[in-house]
Structure formats: C-alpha cells, structure tokens
Amino acid sequence: MIFVDACFGKETEYTPVWMMRQAGRYLPEYMEVRRKIGNFLDMTRNPEVVAEVTIQPIDILDVDAAILFSDILNLPMEMGLPLRFEKGVGPVFDKTIDTEEDIEALDSSADEKLEYVYKGVKLIRERLPEEKALIGFAGSPWTIATYMVEGRGSKQYAKIKKMVYSNPMMLHRLLAFNTKETIEYLSKQIDAGANAVMVFDSWGGALEKEKFFEFSWNYMKEIAKNIKAKYPHIPVILFSKGVGLYMDEMDGEFDVVGVDWATPIDHALRIFKDNYTLQGNMEPTRLYSKTATKEAVEKIAGIMKGHRHIFNLGHGILPDVPVENAKYFVNLCKELTRRG
C-alpha cells in the first residue's frame, strides 16, 4: 500500500494523497445517503452506511487512503454522555463532566459498545481495493475532554481551562480515562482491519505551550506508544491543530505528523527533518480555485521533494467545494510527484 509505505518513509511511485473530511457534504453521493438516513449520528451507527460513504471518495477521487466515516464524539457518547447535534451549534452534550463523581460514573466499557464501528471497518476493508489503505481514528483525550466538560464547541474553553489551573488533578484523571478508552478503541479498529490510525487533536492549540504538553501531547504520546508496542506494522498519525510554534518539543513513538495550514511546511520540515513523515498541508479554501490549488501543490511538492511526505489539506475539505476541484487536487498531487 503506497500510503502505508509513505507513512514509514519508504520510497513510493508518487506522493500519496487523501483529504480530511473527504467522505462528506461536498459529494452529491454522500448527500443522497444522508437524505435517506436523515440523521448524521444514525449514519455513523449503521455499518452498511459507514462502509458506503467511507468508500465514496476512493471511487470518485481515487485518493490513496480511505478514512473511516465516524465522529470523534461517538466514544464519549458511549461512555454515557448522550449526544445530539443542534442546527447552527453542532454537537451538544446536555450532561457534562463537572465533578469527580461524574468521572466515576463514566462507562469504562465504552469501547465494547462501539461494535457498529468495528463492523463498519470490517466491511470497508472487505470492499476496498487491496492497494488502498483504511485509516481508523479517534479524537485526542484533550479534545474529547473539551466537549465532555464544555458540553459543546467553544471559542474560549473557559470551563475546561479553569480546570487546567484550579483542579488539574481531576482533569488528569479524566484524560487518563479517555486515554485508556482510546487505546482500546483504536486497537479494536486495527483488529477489525484498519491499516493505520490517526489521533485528531482539534483543540490542542487552545492551550499555552507548557500546558499543551502536560494536558494534550503527553496523552497522545501514550496512545501512540501503546499502539506501536502492540502493532508495530501499523502507522500512527498524530495531528494537533494550531501548535506550529510548539513543534520544536514534539517527539514520541509515532510515524506521521499532521501539519495544519497555518504552519509553513518548511518550518515543520526543519524541525522534524526525516524522522517522521509530514502530512499536509494545503489551505482548504484554495480548493475553490484551480489556480490557487496548483500554486500551493507546486510549492509544497517543491519543498517536500526527496523528503517523507503525504499530501493532504491543512484541515477538512469544505462542504461547498466543487467535486471537480477536489479531483484536480488529487490528480495534480500525483502528477507533480511521480518519480522516474
């Protein structure tokens, strides 16, 4: 698999490419399925639907890896926090973590309740072309905790950051719980057929540098270490958004570093050299323009020539991007990096 080879820094025919949120609303085929099912959460809990929409970008765009169609909040939902999606707001937990007792009440067998995810993974792997990789994923312990404590997305993260400074021991307890459950969750995705796993730390950048390492990165490292010990042949991808200035202190037993669009990829390359594969990092809104896309792909390909790299966006693809432009991006990445 070209994607797995690139994760491990092996020479490949061209630089593999996929996109975050590639199974999503910009695809008419996805929207058709969503109209039929009606509810996003119900889609994530239906293995047949999960398999269908995960494979759509492979069939339509010919990306080199499929990423499991799911949500990072399915895990805390199965821990016992009822989840709903509110129009104009996004995910909402009406029950939040406010006390030690709330942590005590969380279900420590949440990973066992996610059988619908593992069934989806198994179906996808059975139906995917052999050469295409399947990426399993989870949210980082910190990012999941922000939703569990705040109850929804936030701009200030005041509630959880208050915990950082006034009750760090309680927060560490929650993060340790999330870490244990995430290791189990990712392990079962691998057992079901995932060829790589990725940890998404969407809100790591909400923390100052010292606290980022204490409350986010160290737990992500723990997940990577455990997965690599059990599954050395499985690549582990870590992606923290908004932490470009913290990269100089990042290390650990993982294979790929996701680079967001606000971090120049040459900055990441100077820090990580070829110790890890870099994944990213075109600004997603460039996809509205083929000219802007070409400019960015040429620049990134030039910087990363001869280095460990996987093409991706620096964040998720947006819902109103023309499919034709997404295809153009994928084809261009392959064309400009083809060796020999």
From Swiss-Prot:
GO molecular function: uroporphyrinogen decarboxylase activity
UniProt keywords, alphabetically: Cytoplasm, Decarboxylase, Lyase, Porphyrin biosynthesis
Binding site for substrate: 21-25, 71, 147, 202, 315
Subcellular compartments: Cytoplasm
Single biological process term from Gene Ontology: protoporphyrinogen IX biosynthetic process from glutamate
InterPro entries in UniProt: UROD/MetE-like_sf, Uroporphyrinogen_deCO2ase_HemE, Uroporphyrinogen_deCOase
Gene3D superfamilies to which the protein is assigned, alphabetical: 3.20.20.210
Record-level GO cellular component terms: cytosol
TM spans (from-to): none
Catalysed reaction, written as an equation: uroporphyrinogen III + 4 H(+) = coproporphyrinogen III + 4 CO2
EC number: 4.1.1.37
A Pfam family the protein falls into: URO-D
Site (Transition state stabilizer): 71
Recorded metabolic or biological pathway in which this protein acts: Porphyrin-containing compound metabolism; protoporphyrin-IX biosynthesis; coproporphyrinogen-III from 5-aminolevulinate: step 4/4
Record function comment: Catalyzes the decarboxylation of four acetate groups of uroporphyrinogen-III to yield coproporphyrinogen-III.
Subunit structure: Homodimer.
Full protein name: Uroporphyrinogen decarboxylase
Protein's organism: Nautilia profundicola (strain ATCC BAA-1463 / DSM 18972 / AmH)
Gene: hemE
